[in-house]
From Swiss-Prot:
Name under which the protein is recorded: Ornithine carbamoyltransferase
Gene: argF
EC number: 2.1.3.3
Species in which this protein is naturally found: Moritella abyssi
UniProt cross-references to Pfam families, sorted A to Z: OTCace, OTCace_N
Assembly and interaction partners: The enzyme is present as a mixture of trimers and dodecamers, with the relative proportions of the two forms depending on the salt concentration. In addition, the trimeric fraction could reassociate into dodecamers when the salt concentration is increased. It appears that in vivo, the main fraction is in the dodecameric form.
Amino acid sequence: MENLLSVKDLSKQQILDLLALAKAVKANPAEYSQALAGKSIVTIYEKPSLRTRVTFDIGIHKLGGHAVYLDAQNGAIGERETVKDFAANISRWADAIVARVVSHKTLEGLVEHGSVPVVNSLCDLYHPCQALADFLTISEHYEDVSKVKLAYVGEGNNVTHSLMLTGAILGAEVTAVCPRGSSPDAQIVKQAMALAEISGGKINVTDNLDDIVDYDVIYGDTWVSMGDDTPLAQVKEKYMPYQINKALLMRTGIKHVLHCQPAHRELEITSEVMDGEHSLIFDQAENRMHAQNAVLLTLLK
């Protein structure tokens, strides 16, 4: 593994190895406290962040490395100077680049013109670090993730894409339940389906919540993706039937709940569920750090 732009670039064994390493780092942090000693990692943010920034900054520190934070004060990458020059300069100073960007093309430019590993910490198409944290969380409750049935409910987006691709590679069943007109990208769904054929997994897209009865895990996200300035009130009528609430859990028999956050309580998910016995949401947030640490350790070993 030279970079992490999308989980579709990883094999099943590579994903399983990352999950195993994340568990090892989580269980024995002292053993890895100097694993990145002498390493400097530039973290770039074109978009706002809480979980991504804090988990990367603290995670890198816990591994003995040094994180350098760059925000969008100089504009998006490629505006003040070319992506080529930006990547070439950063590569002379840093050991890796972690980038949360508006466009996936920016990440491809960083890889093309840089000479250090690049990690996608979110873009318009994918959110691979989130998906790895999600399946790390799932694997803590299900010994064989290939037998897990995961339902994503809401708007098809970058998180949906990465969940589908990761589940497909691992051999799990992943269903995206989205209102009509809000399905995930058709080309990425096609890619996930092709990967599932190889692994024995299954990828589905539906608008019917009855299709996820007896699933294991349900996953929510905001109804309006970051960068979309559509008022929530405008989409509330469309998405409200897909709210993750106690009634839906009882109707489907689903045991565990995930949400990548930030969450709009009483909209896509109720507080009763988010704070309830079925919720793994804050374990999931913690696991962002451990999954990302595993990625950095693998890239910089």
